[in-house]
């Protein structure tokens, strides 16, 4: 995301903090509901120590807050820069491995959270078949397996993100909304940033052009016009001779 002004940075931070709070509230509410249901209908859950029960609330609140913040950032960028942003990346022409990497980067956090939840469920099912362990021991085993798999997935996501950035072409054609006609899509060649903020000037130019359009001003000075930028400056030699 490209934030060009301090006001946009503040607005983005407010939006992110609000989404974090909402996600933590929703996730914690679901965790508390699961806690209450488990205490009422499961004798094994009631025998668990308080630390394991509280981990259910903390884990669900943290995971939901991350997902909410990620979705809020994408929504903020789409609302603020929708007319300059990409509409269709047209990944059909890319090889299958690059399409898979692109899909993983777009849905990274839901995949990680889903992997943790599915591993936790499968581990609980496998541990429940052992008749010699107690319920707390089964839950601890399931949590260890789930955490181990989640750590492996996190490390793999870092590697895949680095690999996707390395395989991304330096220039690709995307479709963007025509500022003069919002119902029309035009082809645009997007260049890859070699370092963060390299193409920041393009966003600034687009914003300035949009401001000039709202004021009904020309985007460029007419050729041969006399203005502050076209006023000739006297040469040093002529001023000295005078």
Curated annotation (Swiss-Prot):
Stretches assigned to the HIG1 domain: 80-172
Biased composition annotated in UniProt, kind: Polar residues: 227-242
Subcellular location: Mitochondrion; Membrane
GO biological process: mitochondrial cytochrome c oxidase assembly; proton transmembrane transport
Cysteines joined through disulfide linkages: none
Region called Disordered, residue ranges: 215-242
Membrane-related topology note: Multi-pass membrane protein
Chief localisation class: mitochondrion
Keywords assigned: Membrane, Mitochondrion, Transmembrane, Transmembrane helix
Any Gene Ontology CC annotation: respiratory chain complex IV
A Pfam short name: HIG_1_N
Segments crossing the lipid bilayer: 18-38, 48-68, 108-128, 144-164
Job description of the protein: Cytochrome c oxidase subunit which plays a role in assembly of respiratory supercomplexes.
PANTHER family registered for this protein in UniProt: RESPIRATORY SUPERCOMPLEX FACTOR 2, MITOCHONDRIAL
Subunit description: Associates with the respiratory chain complex III/complex IV supercomplex.
Protein name as catalogued: Respiratory supercomplex factor 2 homolog C1565.01
Lineage: Eukaryota, Fungi, Dikarya, Ascomycota, Taphrinomycotina
């Amino acid at each position: 995301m490209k934030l060009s002004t301090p006001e946009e940075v503040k607005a983005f931070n407010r939006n992110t903090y609000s989404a974090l709070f909402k996600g933590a509230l929703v996730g914690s509410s679901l965790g508390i509901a699961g806690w209450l249901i488990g205490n009422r209908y499961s004798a094994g859950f009631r025998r668990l120590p308080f630390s394991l029960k509280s981990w259910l609330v903390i884990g669900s609140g943290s995971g939901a807050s991350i997902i909410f913040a990620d979705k809020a950032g994408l929504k903020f960028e789409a609302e603020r820069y929708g007319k300059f942003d990409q509409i269709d990346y047209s990944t059909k022409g890319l090889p299958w491995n690059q399409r898979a990497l692109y899909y993983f980067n777009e849905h990274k956090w839901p995949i990680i959270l889903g992997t943790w939840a599915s591993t936790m469920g499968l581990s609980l099912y496998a541990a429940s078949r052992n008749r010699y362990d107690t319920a707390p021991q089964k839950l601890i085993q399931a949590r260890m397996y789930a955490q181990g798999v989640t750590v492996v997935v996190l490390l793999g996501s870092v590697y895949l993100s680095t690999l996707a950035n390395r395989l991304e072409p330096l220039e690709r054609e995307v479709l963007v909304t025509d500022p003069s006609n919002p119902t029309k899509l035009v082809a645009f060649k997007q260049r890859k940033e070699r370092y963060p903020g390299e193409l920041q000037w393009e966003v600034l130019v687009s914003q300035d052009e949009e401001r000039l359009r709202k004021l009904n001003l020309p985007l460029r000075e007419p050729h041969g016009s006399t203005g502050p930028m076209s006023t000739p400056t006297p040469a040093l030699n002529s001023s000295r001779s005078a």
